[in-house]
Amino acid sequence: HLSQSPISSLPFPGFENVRLTHRQLVAAVRNDTWKTALGNVQAVYLQTDRRTGWHYVGSAYSHKGAEQGLLSRWSEYAYGDHSGGNKRLKELGAKYIVDNFQYSILEIFDMRALPKDIINREHWWMDTLSSVYHSEDEHPHGYNSVAERNSDNPVE
């Protein structure tokens, strides 16, 4: 099963079969086959907190050709700030994320897709999975902020 196997020994399984722990994510962004696949698409992806079931929906797009799509975004999660700048994820801390989060791909786009189109799909997935945190919710289950959901602007 992919979620329990070491990435270094597995071929890329196809975008629809990606489900990685944080440790596997780190291995994937180092693996040449995975790097090629992830670097050639833009995407809407899902982070799942396996402990609580909460979700975070994010998008990865190349702004002015400067980034390598999903590879750039997931490399940030692997090596940099595990929160991607999200306030609620930051509050959890890096160790919690490493121990409890898994990463999957909801939808892919070729590198010519416009950021606004990807963001529209990201918002659709946020609404579909109810991943936006509202303080008035009796049982919230999402890490996305209202500001993230309402923003129509690509991140600079």
Regions found by a protein language model. Name each.
Residues 1-57, 61, 155:
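GIY-YIG nuclease catalytic motif and its immediate N-terminal context
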Residues 112-133:
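Domain-level recognition of nuclease-like catalytic cores that cleave nucleotide substrates
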Residues 34, 54, 74, 124-125:
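A residue-identity detector for tryptophan
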